Each structure stands twice: as C-alpha cells, then as structure tokens.
C-alpha cells in the first residue's frame, strides 16, 4: 500500500458569511495523480491556498507526510501538533508560512502563470533552485559559494532539457508560446525538488493540442521524479485521462470521490454538472 502524502481533515474555510470550503476531507497517496473538480468554480483554489500556507483554515487540519502543516481547532481541545516551532507543544492553531511549506516538499503552480518576466528561461529556474540550497541570491551574485552555484547551473540546464526548454534557455520567459510558459512554470516548481506537485488549472488558456501534450507531460514528470500530483482543472478530458482518483465538490462541499469511471457514473456529479430539469 502506498504511503499517505497529503491528508486534509475536515477543513472549512470561511470568509465572513461565505463558506468557500465546507468540512472537506481528502487525501493523496504516494505516486498518485489526484484531481479536484467543481462545476461552480468555487473552493478549489481556496483549498490549495489552505494547503500551501496562504490561508489559515477556519477549522480542520492539513497533514503532509505525517506532519501537521496547518490546523485550526477553535472549538476543540488543545492538541499536541507537530509542525516547525510548534513541535511538541499543545496548541489549537498551526500555520506554516508558504516558504517553509515549500522547503518541506510542496510546490505549486498558479492558474495565471507567474514567471519572472524580465528574466531568461534559465534564470527563472535557477532562482527557484535557491529556495532549497544553502546559498542565497547574495552569495550567488558575488560567487561566495561558487561550487554550489556551478552545481545549480548544471542542474538547471539538465532540468530544462528534461522539460524540453534547453534550446530556449537564453530567451526571455515572456517570449515563449503559452504552452511552453506553462512548462517553464512547472520546471520552476520541480527545481525545488517537491514530493507533492500542486497544479492549479494547468491547461487554462491552452488549445486542444497543447492540452493533450500537457497531459502526457504531467504523467511523464510524475513518473520520472516520483511525484504525487494534486491538480484542479476544468478540462474534463485531461482530468479523466490522467487521474487515479477524483474528488468533486459543489459549493465547497464534497459530493463524490472515486476513480474516473466511478465519477462519470455518479448521479450526484451528473446532477451538479448537468442540472435537473424542472417539471
């Protein structure tokens, strides 16, 4: 049985009177591609933000590789949680910052591609490498740790070769076609050496051929790097083609989970996506 990588336990996220995520539980195991879909477009990115430290959940907890990285139990008893500076202490709230979560092995991309627009393809990936190295931008700039810098440059080039962007390494990131910009963003996430890769609408803005190529690319990098992949996506063909398991939420509440075949035949999912004719 594969080890559990991500576990979301009874997470609720509320903004004022709006409940974006309602008591959601889900998990992803080692080596899986798990998708989260929502016909109403609400709640998917919110749960991503709870997992990656952008939001503190209103209630519930997020566990990554056995460690609690986010938790809020306002109505519960003080619990012994294990996360960074909270290690071994009794507390109701745990919230690791996004940079600490990245260093633990979670990387994400965004629906709207976020690249360093004035930097080259090569430098976009190299900058991401610094997040997991002992050197920083200052030491790299003044070559205070030249051996580590050289190793990072070699690794950056190798990663660009793997994702098919080595020939464009000296071009500005924004000069790339949209599909290649998405590959670059994923390459930058891979540069942090994640265990869990979270993809937020990776096929957004792509044409059908680019979407087909992206689907194969996701499977290839998952296998090559031994990743667990968690994605949210509107392109149902992509989701059904590559996912091992799928969770479906409707207005922030989970209505179904299962294999692609099970989800396609689930009456609650069919109703949520297609509606019910009124008599």
Regions found by a protein language model. Name each.
Residues 2-279:
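Glycine-rich phosphate-binding loops of nucleotide-dependent enzymes
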